[in-house]
A protein has these predicted regions:
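Short, surface-exposed patches at the edges or C-terminal ends of soluble domains, predominantly
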Residues: 2-298
Length: 298
């Protein structure tokens, strides 16, 4: 190689090395990025831990009134319900350990059977059905409630996921059920950037009335809740902090997340029921109150 070519090569190498050194260092031929000279200082968004509420205490157990006679509880699993067996497991364990019977309404015995099944039970649990109830099923459910049967329904916000074919939206189908009970469920999720419990969608709720359902419930932790709109004939049971926002309504407010209309209770979340979540804060008190409501012991 001629001397002139050597000089040009050395010059090019020096320029490249200097450019790389501005933003990083070279170690054994590998570019290693340098850490930023300053840490982010924007509160809340870039440092969300500054907005976290103290984590809820994981303690307590579910105790219910043991004086009620044996009852049979039906859990709906026939309407493409979201993770129904996982979310109903704690309810099932508490009920059966107190001498009550739990049965599932399964897809294989769905057609034409709902009317018969509800006539055999004392209460019904419905967890996030993503398939609509038929007109016959809704009529049977209304008749069941009018005759003194009790229903607890857990709903959820709309969810969007992505698969090989694109976006898939899953929506809980409770609107046709709830029209008879002066309660409607939203489709958006609730969140709180200023007082959440770990993540922005993990929110705190507290009692909104002096009903037995809200007794000893001062700090419930909800994981993916939607809001409820309550008519004059229904009563709010739980509400969020006033700094809570909605992904659809886009405003801070104290949103209702549990409500009652006579023999029907609606809750805007079901994840708090699971084995890993029911011990957080006052969740076990809420679960116990809901079970006593099902058993007509409230």
């Amino acid at each position: 190689m001629r001397p002139g070519e050597w000089a040009r090569l050395v010059a090019v190498f020096a320029i490249v090395f200097a450019a790389v050194s501005v933003s990083g260092v070279v170690i054994s031929g590998v570019f290693m990025p340098q850490p930023p000279s300053e840490q982010p200082t924007s509160p809340g968004v870039l440092a969300p831990e500054r907005n976290l509420a103290p984590p809820p205490v994981e303690a307590g157990s579910i105790e219910i009134n043991g004086t009620t006679s044996q009852q049979t509880i039906l859990i709906d699993a026939a309407h493409q319900n979201t993770q129904v067996r996982d979310r109903a497991q704690v309810l099932t364990d508490v009920l059966t350990s107190n001498g009550h019977q739990v049965s599932y309404y399964n897809p294989e015995n769905k057609i034409g059977q709902f009317e018969n099944r509800v006539s055999e039970v004392d209460a019904i649990v419905i967890i996030a059905p993503t398939q609509r109830y038929t007109q016959a099923e809704r009529t049977a459910l209304n008749d069941f409630v009018n005759e003194g049967g009790r229903v607890v329904l857990f709903t959820e916000p709309k969810r969007t996921s992505v698969n090989l074919f694109g976006e898939v939206t899953t929506r809980v189908r409770t609107e046709s059920i709830l029209t008879s009970y002066a309660i409607s469920a939203g489709t958006g999720y609730l969140y709180n950037l200023n007082g959440n419990v770990g993540t922005f969608q993990t929110i705190a709720a507290t009692s909104a009335s002096n009903q037995r359902l809200a007794e000893n419930v001062e700090n419930v932790t909800l994981y993916t809740s939607t809001s409820l709109t309550v008519g004059d004939e229904a009563t709010p049971v739980l509400e969020t902090q006033p700094t809570t926002n909605s992904s659809t309504l886009r405003s801070n407010a104290s949103y209702t997340v549990a409500a009652r209309h006579g023999n029907v209770v609606v809750v805007g979340d079901s994840e708090f029921l699971t084995e890993q979540n029911y011990r957080k804060g006052d969740n076990e008190e809420l679960v116990g109150n809901l079970i006593e409501f099902l058993l007509n012991a409230d």
